[in-house]
Each structure stands twice: as C-alpha cells, then as structure tokens.
A protein has these predicted regions:
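Cross-family detector of peptidyl-prolyl cis-trans isomerase
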Residues: 2-5, 25-180
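Sec-dependent signal peptide hydrophobic core
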Residues: 5, 9-17
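C-terminal motif of bacterial Sec signal peptides marking the signal peptidase cleavage site
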Residues: 20-24
C-alpha cells in the first residue's frame, strides 16, 4: 500500500467515525419532556363518559379536572374557597394508577383513617380546590388532576415536575368560617 492510499483510508475512517459520533449527539432524551407527554396522555385517558370536566370560574383559568362522583353527599352543604374541610384522600401518580390500580404506590394515604385535621380549601393544590368545590359534605369521588394544576407545596405529596395526580377522596365535613 502506498502512503497516499493509507492516508485516504485513514481520512475516510476518521470522516465516517465523526459522522457517526455527531449523529449520536442528537439523540439525547429530555426526561422532563418525556414525563410531561406521558402524564398528559394519562390525564386525557380519563376523558370519557364516566368522568365529567369540573371547573370553578376564576380558578385555574380554563383549567379543569376530571371528576367521577361515587356518592353524592348532602347537596345542602357545598364547599366554598373560604371553608375548611376534613378531606380523607389517597393520592397516586396518574401513570402509576393506570398501570397498577390499587397496587400503585400512594403518595398520601388518609382514606382509611378514622380522623384527620381540617384543612383550609385555599391551602389545597389548585386542582384539588376545583374538585372539592364541586362536591358536597359526605361525598366520595375519584379525581384526576393535570400536572399544571398540581402545585402542591406539601412535603408529603411532593412530585416530580409534570406529574398528574389521581385521587380517591371522601369529604367528611365542611367547616364554614365563623361570622363575627
């Protein structure tokens, strides 16, 4: 082999390996974007006749949650933003719930407890505020909240970015603010 042939082969090999190396750089996966897409698909999967879109004017813009009321509760006792509630709930990642149902890991578990502390509605994540204000005292429901209404600051329900949530809830009591 001549030195020119050897140089040509070496140059060709370097060019080919450079092209292969550069093309692999474009295949990075954006984990947050993947999680967002997966959670949006999971949320949209609840758009059927079993669930209704629930909204509250002035909360969350045009945002909505999916709500399926299992037990109506006392329709004479509704929930307002200024109320406090005794809200028993089990919280799951929507993607986990779709895969494993009751075997899914719970982010919060109070549904089976006998007593819990009351919480101001205003302190709940926005999506849960919307859902609760569409329920009545004594109601039981399942709720699906999109990632953009899951703005919880609670350390017991902390989630990754772009995580939609699935709730099983029982609204035991509505506590109206006292008037002075």
């Amino acid at each position: 082999m001549t030195s020119k042939t050897l140089q040509s082969l070496l140059l060709g090999s370097l060019t080919l390996s450079s092209l292969v190396g550069l093309s692999s750089c474009n295949s990075t996966i954006d984990v947050d974007q993947e999680r967002r897409s997966e959670n949006e698909r999971a949320f949209r999967s609840f758009a059927d006749s079993a669930y209704t879109k629930a909204t509250v004017p002035g909360i969350g813009g045009s945002g909505f949650v999916y709500l399926k009321v299992e037990k109506e509760g006392d329709k004479s006792i509704g929930v307002d933003y200024t109320d406090a509630v005794e809200l028993f709930r089990d919280t799951y990642r929507t993607t986990d719930w779709l895969k494993d149902k009751f075997k899914a890991t719970r982010l919060r578990q109070t549904l089976d407890m006998n007593a819990i502390e009351q919480e101001p509605v205003a302190n709940l994540p926005v999506g849960l505020q919307i859902a609760v204000q569409n329920l009545h005292q004594g109601a039981e429901a399942t709720i699906v909240i999109p990632w953009y209404l899951n703005n919880t600051t609670s350390t017991s329900e902390r989630t990754d970015s772009y995580t939609s949530l699935y709730y099983r809830v029982r609204l035991k009591k509505v506590i109206k603010p006292s008037t002075k």
